[in-house]
C-alpha cells in the first residue's frame, strides 16, 4: 500500500514538472524563436537597415533597451532638434509632408475600419509594438510567406450594391462586365510584362484649355471610392506601383480600359478627402493576397500607407506650385529678361508635356522597377523627373506657347504686378538653385548667353533688372578669387583683365541656341543625377551587405550561445532527475527508519507514562508535607515579625528622645552663636568709631602740618625775597663803584695825553741835540702800570632751588645715580611729602591761575589733516579727559608719610 502511494506521488511530481517544462517552452523559448524568425525576415527584406533586437536577458540589456528608439517609429510625433541644411531642404519638406499625410490617413483609417474583438494571445515585441502603433488594425498572424502568397490566386467577395455601383461607373469593357456578374472574382497573377503592356495601352485624354485642378463631385466618386486595387506581394511593391499621370477626370470607358476590376472585402464606405476618393484612378493592377488576414496586413501596413500618403501630398503640393507659377506668369509682364526667363520655363514645361505621351509608359515601368530595388529614393529625383510636369493635363489642341513677342504684346505693367513678378522671379531662381546640387549646376559660361561687342540698345529704367545684393557680392567674390588664383606666368603681356561688372540690359539670343543649351544642361543634370543615384544605390547595397554580414555573425553568436544555454539546461535537468531519484531512495529509507523509531517511541512513552504516574504520586505526598512545613514556617515567621515590630517601636522612641535632646542642644548653641555675633558686631562698631577718631586726628594733624609747612614756605619765600633784594643792592653798589673807577681812569688818561702833547710841543720848539733825559723822573713812566690786572666780572650766586631751568641745561636727562646738578631739597624728603599732601587735600585751581587752555587744533598747526590727528595719542587731541580714578591711584602710589 505504501509503495502504491509513493508511485502515485512520483507520477504526480513528474506530471507537474512536465507541465512546467512545457509552459516554460511556450512562454519563453517559443517567443524567442518567433522573435528570431521575425528578425531574420526583417534582415532579408529589401528595406531593412536597423539592428536586430531580441528580448533582453540581463538587467544591463534591459537598461540598454530603454535607451534605444522603438523599432516602429511614432508617426504622430514631430521630430525636433534637427539641423536644416540647404542641400536637404527638399528632403526635409517631403518628410514633413509624409508625416502630416500619415497622420490624416491614420485618422481616416480609425474612422473607417471596423473593430474586431481581439483574443488574448502571446505576442512578440514587434507584434506588440505594431498593435500599439496601429490599434485599429486587428493583429493576425501571417501563416505563409510573401512568396507563397504571390503564387496564389485571390478570390474577393463583394456585395450586390458594390457590383451595381461598379457597373454604373465602369462600363465599356465586355470582359470586365462578364467578370463583374459573379460575386467571386478570381484575380490571376500579373507579371511585369503584362503591367508594361497595360501601361502602354493608356491613351492620354484631352485636356481642357484652362489648366485648373479638377474637382470631382461627391455623388459620382462615392460609389467608386469603395473599389480598392489589390496590393502587391510586398508592401513596398504596392507602394511603388502608382501612376501619377492621371489627375483630371476621364471618361468611364478609358477608366475601364486602364484598370481591371479588383475589389476588397470592405463593407464600409471610407470617408476621406477628394484626392483619397480619386486614388482608384491613380493605381495599377497588382496581385491581391490570398486571404482576408493577409489582405488587411498588406493593406494597412505602415510602409504602404507611408508611401501612398507621401505621393499624394507631393502631388498636391506640386499642383499648387505649378498653378501659382502659371497664374504669376500670365499676370506678370516685367522686363524682357524676366519674360525671357518665364518663356524658357514655360517652353521647358511644354517640351516635357509633349514628350510625356510617348515616354510615360516606359518611364513609369522603369521607375517602378527602380523603386522596387531602392524604396527609399530621395524626393528630389521624383519631383524632377516623374512628378514635376505630370500634373499638367494633356490636350488634343496645340500647346499654348508664351514667347517674347506675346509678352511684349501685353499691356504695360502696374507697379504692383511688377513687384509681384520680381518676387516670383527671385523665388523661382532660388528654388532652381536649391534643386540643383553643386556638381549639377551649369557654369557661368553655360548660364549666360554669348555677349556681343556692339553696344546694346538703351533700355527704359522701369525694365532694368538689378541683380539682388547677395548675387552681386557672390559674383564679386568669384571674380576676386579668380584674380587671386592667377599666376604671373599665366597672364600675358597683351592680355586685358576681364571685367566682372554685369550689364543690366538684356542681350538678344538665338532661341535655337538657347534651346540647345537648355537641353545640354538638362542632359548633364540627368547624367549627374543618374550617377549620383547609382553611387547612392551602390553605397546602400554595400551597407546592406555589411549589415547583413554583421547580423548573420551576431545571430550565429546568439544561436551558439543559445545552444550552450540549452546544453547547460539539459545537463541541469539530468542532474535534477538524478537528485530526485536519490531523494526518493533516501525518503524510502527514512520512512522505514521512521516506522522503527515510532515503535520504539511508543514503548518508551508507555514506560515514561508509568514513571510519570509514580513521580506524580510522590510529588503529591511531598507537596502535602511541604504545605505543613510551610504553615509551621509561616507561624514562626509571624512570631518573629511581631517581636521585630516591638523592638523597632522601642528603637524609634529612643531615636525621638535623642532627636529632641539634639534639637535643644542645637538651639542653645545657636543662641550662644547669636550672642557671640552681637558681641563681635559691637566690637566692630567700637573699632570703627576708634578708627574714625584716629583718622580725624590724623586729618587734623595733617592739616596742622600743612599749615606749618605753608608758614615755613611763606617764611622761606620772604627770606628769599630779602636775599634777592640784598643781592640786587650789592650789585647796584658794585656797578656804581666800577662806573666811578672808569670815570677817574678816563680823566687820568686824558690829563696824561694833554701833558704829553705839551711836552712834544716844547721839544719840537727847542733844540734836541746833546740833551740828556732822565727816565726815572719822566712822567711817561708813571702813566700806566707795566702789568695791569685782568678784569673779573662779579660771580652771580646760583639758586639751588632752581633745578635745571637755566640756559645751560640740554635736552638729555640726568642719570639718577650721577645727576649733573644737586637735587633740590623740595624734590625729596619731607618737603616732597608735604607738597604732595597739600596738593592732594587742597589742589590748586589751575584754570583760575592760568586761564582755560584750549585743545590745540593740529590742522591749523600743520596746515593739513590726517586720520591720526583724531586719535587719542600724545600728538593728537584728547576728546575725553582721563579717568578721575587714575588721579587717586597716582596720589596713593607715592605713599603718604605720617
Swiss-Prot record:
- Give yes or no: UniProt keyword Nucleus: yes
- Please provide the record's free-text comment about the domains of this protein: The IN box mediates interaction with aurkb/aurora-B.
What is this protein identified as? Inner centromere protein
InterPro entries (UniProt xref)? INCENP_N (IPR022006), Inner_centromere_prot_ARK-bd (IPR005635)
Q: Which organism is it from?
A: Xenopus tropicalis (Western clawed frog)
Compositionally biased region (Basic residues): 60-69
Keywords recorded for this protein, A-Z:
Cell cycle, Cell division, Centromere, Chromosome, Chromosome partition, Cytoplasm, Cytoskeleton, Kinetochore, Microtubule, Mitosis, Nucleus, Phosphoprotein
Keyword Magnesium annotated: no
Which family is it part of?
Belongs to the INCENP family.
Localization recorded for this chain is: Nucleus; Chromosome; Chromosome, Centromere; Cytoplasm, Cytoskeleton, Spindle
Q: Which domain of life is it from?
A: Eukaryota
Q: Name one Pfam family in it.
A: INCENP_N
* Record function comment: Component of the chromosomal passenger complex (CPC), a complex that acts as a key regulator of mitosis. The CPC complex has essential functions at the centromere in ensuring correct chromosome alignment and segregation and is required for chromatin-induced microtubule stabilization and spindle assembly. Acts as a scaffold regulating CPC localization and activity.
Q: Quick one: where's region SAH?
A: 512-730
Q: For bias kind Polar residues, which ranges apply? A: 259-272
> What's the name of its gene?
incenp
**Which stretches does UniProt call biased (Pro residues)?**
455-470
Where do the segments described as Disordered lie?
50-127, 251-282, 358-379, 406-470, 525-548, 564-677, 707-770, 802-824
Query: Which cellular component terms (GO) are annotated to the entry?
Result: chromosome; chromosome passenger complex; cytoplasm; kinetochore; microtubule; midbody; nucleus; spindle
PTM-bearing positions, type Phosphoserine: 874-875
* Basic and acidic residues bias locations: 367-376, 431-449, 564-600, 607-677, 707-759
GO molecular function terms listed in the Swiss-Prot or TrEMBL record: protein kinase binding
